[in-house]
């Protein structure tokens, strides 16, 4: 039995509650739903779901996106989707537009993309729409252009969960949020939600580092900030995949890295749910992370593109896989997948994708 089969079997047996009270996605049901959909599509008229699907990755320097890529390839095969080789836009919004056009020229009849820039991606979406090629956006919602579905988690909840954890565990002093790219709706949502939530903790002072999802930028800025503010008590990393390693290296170099429980410990909450974050939680280097569902991003990105190619449409409301579809804007639907807070108390949960991918 391979890792994917073991993961699916374990997930089939687990129905857990998130700390927010939201029901965890029953991965077994979700998988069954994908299989059922695949069967339904197979019975559709000839040509209804035929054609190659293009896969555009925003970057591959982050362990999160590396994991997402592996899940994409697995589920594309499992769902019998004829996928073109994934293209890596390498963190460059302009390159992503070029890559999307390349996929169209290669004959893609549908595209799954992780947008880098919420506005800039609109040009590529318009090009796809001109050829009647449906697009599913994963992780980042576009602010312009047409998509069949947006698949992401509630990114405002990421910022709120990080704020609440730090607010409850730091109590007083300075906290830093290392922000993502504010050209991305994800960066804006997390930053704004963290900032707004922190107003409820008047004894905490928020310092900010705009790092645009770049680890080297985060490291340099954090080094300078800590030199001027050696009394920082907490840090929020908006993307553990790119910020975790440089943050820990900077704290270690400044002799500020102490394990959780030590009076000198700097509390850290991250986002992503990658295996490296879980190991850092177990060591006591960081305290928590919000697990972005890389597995479900891939699964449902492909689910919705196959549905779009078969002519299926959806409406706002609860889904059969534990999430909620909301209307972001007129004609733009978003399937908001749950993302649990992971701490030392539940870091070994085998239902978390970061504990199953190898």
Residue ranges with predicted function:
Residues 52-71, 75-79, 84-99, 108, ...:
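Extracytoplasmic "Venus flytrap"
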Residues 101, 109, 113-129, 194, ...:
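Hydrophobic alpha-helical
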Residues 96, 151-175, 188-189, 217-219, ...:
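Hydrophobic alpha-helical segments within soluble ligand-binding/sensing domains
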Residues 64-79, 158-162, 185-204, 221, ...:
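Short, solvent-exposed amphipathic alpha-helices that sit
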Residues 17-33:
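Bacterial N-terminal signal peptides that target proteins for export
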């Amino acid at each position: 039995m391979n890792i994917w089969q073991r993961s699916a079997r374990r997930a089939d047996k687990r129905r857990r509650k998130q700390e927010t009270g939201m029901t965890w996605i029953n991965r077994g049901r979700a998988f069954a739903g994908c299989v059922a959909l695949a069967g339904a599509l197979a019975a559709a008229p000839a040509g209804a779901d035929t054609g190659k699907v293009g896969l555009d990755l925003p970057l591959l320097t982050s362990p999160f996106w590396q994991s997402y890529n592996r899940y994409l390839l697995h589920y594309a095969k499992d769902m019998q989707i004829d996928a073109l080789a994934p293209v890596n836009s390498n963190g460059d919004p302009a390159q992503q537009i070029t890559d999307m056009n390349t996929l169209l020229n290669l004959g893609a009849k549908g595209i799954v993309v992780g947008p880098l820039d919420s506005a800039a991606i609109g040009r590529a979406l318009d090009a796809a729409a001109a050829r009647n090629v449906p697009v599913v956006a994963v992780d980042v919602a576009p602010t312009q252009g047409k998509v069949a579905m947006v698949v992401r988690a509630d990114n405002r909840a990421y910022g709120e969960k990080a704020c609440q954890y730090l607010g409850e565990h730091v109590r007083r002093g300075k906290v830093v949020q290392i922000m993502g790219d504010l050209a991305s709706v994800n960066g804006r949502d997390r930053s704004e939600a963290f900032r707004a939530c922190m107003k409820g903790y008047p004894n905490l002072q928020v310092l900010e580092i705009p790092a645009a999802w770049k680890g080297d930028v985060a490291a340099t800025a954090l080094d300078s900030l800590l030199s001027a503010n050696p009394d920082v008590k907490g840090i929020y990393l908006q993307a553990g995949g790119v910020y975790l390693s440089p943050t820990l290296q900077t704290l270690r170099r400044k002799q500020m890295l102490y394990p959780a429980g030590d009076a000198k410990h700097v509390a850290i909450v991250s986002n992503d749910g990658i295996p490296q974050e879980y190991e850092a939680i177990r060591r006591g280097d960081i305290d928590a992370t919000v697990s972005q569902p890389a597995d479900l991003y891939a699964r449902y990105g492909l689910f919705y593109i196959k549905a779009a190619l078969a002519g299926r449409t959806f409406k706002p409301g609860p889904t059969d896989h534990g999430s909620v579809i909301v209307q972001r804007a007129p004609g733009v639907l978003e399937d908001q997948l749950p993302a649990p807070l992971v701490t030392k108390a539940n870091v070994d949960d085998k239902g978390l994708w970061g504990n199953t991918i190898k």
